Amino acid sequence: MDTSTQQRIISLIKKEVVPATGCTEPVAVALAAAQAASLMEQRPDHVEVLLSPNILKNAMGVGIPGTGMIGLPIAIALGIVVADPTKQLKVLDGIAPEQLEEAKKIVDGKIIQVAVKQGDIDKLYIEINMSAGSESASTIIEKIHTNIIYAAHNGQVVIDGRHDAADKSESASSESEEEIALSFEMVYDFAMNTPTEEIEFILEAARLNRHASEVSMKGNYGHAVGRMIQGSLGRRYLGDSSLTRMLTYTSSACDARMDGAPVTVMSNSGSGNQGITATLPVLSFAEDEQADHERTVRALVLSNLMVIYIKQKLGRLSALCGCVVAATGSSCGLCYLMGGTKEQIGFAIKNMIGNITGMLCDGAKPSCSMKVSSGVSSAMFSALLAMEKKVVTSNEGIVDDDVDQSIDNLTSIGRDGMNATDTLVLNIMTSKK
């Protein structure tokens, strides 16, 4: 791989692996609210929020950092109060008590109306229209959580990238994908051969996500899956092993994040849980194996870049649980740390695809830590089987002899084949009494 290609991939990783405070879907809605509010001279007395079904699904039941509350209204209200879109996915970071009280008053005022946007829209679509008397402001985010394609104040356009967005492919594409289209060969080559000093920035993801795990273990967040694994019953029946330690690391960070703990994690491809799942199992196993600095860095890069590659094909949001993708990345990192060859790492990918493809996404919520645990367990099993040169073959289900084609099969199911499932899941979620 030439130096130019390496630099383009480094730029891609730095674009896709970024800090985020809170679940990225409600945070993205808060960002849109902050953008619109930043244009207003007065506090709005009416706020209309129109969302794609996938955004609504992922924002309904998740905790909002530092509030003790769940769901969209408080996230939107905080965005209005903060009114600082330059903070991007950290727009809810460092909320002051007086800001929270002001946001709660906005929620209590019932000025926020949330609905599904009708028509042919991207799976990641957020539109906010707010007004106060004769003053108004609007914002649209599309395709990427921070991609503000439109903003206007009193009908005067401030930002307009809608035509550019319309010209892009309607497939699961993004700016980063247009820069460089990855493959299994490229991901492996980059992770193995790029100078370590140029990719060791990935250790910041390990540091941030480990911190989230440590915060969680000191508290009682969500379903406390991580604490359960390390508790008396967990140790009695699950034991103490590399697997249980990586499960603890990963699930506890997810516990905290989904319950709204005020922690910043390093996301991957727009998802904090994907960043956690791509990072912490690999970090935990590297520590257990006493892997040196270089091997740890390369394993983390291999895992995270594999997630980016699969998400290029799948899209930012889908009916497929993101932990399937992220755990596939971590399985690659685990296999590498076990001494696996390129062929065996490919086996690990096929084993993952042959196992947990089809795990559906029913929104971001505390129980995501249980799905993450399932993904991490499968990642370990898939890597171990690969080391034994055991692999799901092309005679079995959707797996193909070619690794890239197997990934294509996985992503086409999540992107195209599960759309009816996605609709049914949202209908069930929104019709519960």
Curated annotation (Swiss-Prot):
Membership in a protein family: Belongs to the UPF0597 family.
GO MF assignments: L-cysteine desulfhydrase activity
Transmembrane segments: none
Protein name: UPF0597 protein PG_0909
Lineage: Bacteria, Pseudomonadati, Bacteroidota, Bacteroidia, Bacteroidales
Organism per entry: Porphyromonas gingivalis (strain ATCC BAA-308 / W83)
Pfam family of the protein (one): SDH_alpha
InterPro entries: Ser_deHydtase-like_asu (IPR005130), UPF0597 (IPR021144)
Any one biological process term the GO annotation gives: L-cysteine catabolic process to pyruvate
